[in-house]
């Protein structure tokens, strides 16, 4: 199985892919649904590690729909996998560190909301908002 680290950004994301043969493939792309689908749909199934952020949940769900195993890591525990090689912080280094942490299992998963809980939360939020009008 391949191991992928993704450093997500609102506009652009950096991807580091460690293949089964040990090759490192790096790619920078716009963080857009169609571009992510185009890149990941034909790739071998992979374990993908991304840090929790405002956009991590929709990216994780999209990649899971494509058949990949996605882990959203708790960024509060980033020193576990990212501090060793970080003299200057760059997206490329972060993606590489995430890919290596994915391969080694050196991360702490973040809590993820299920679809049902998300729908229930939105319904309750809308109800509370409507009650204030």
Descriptions of predicted regions:
Residues 1-133:
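Phosphate- and other anionic-substrate recognition elements at nucleic-acid/protein interfaces
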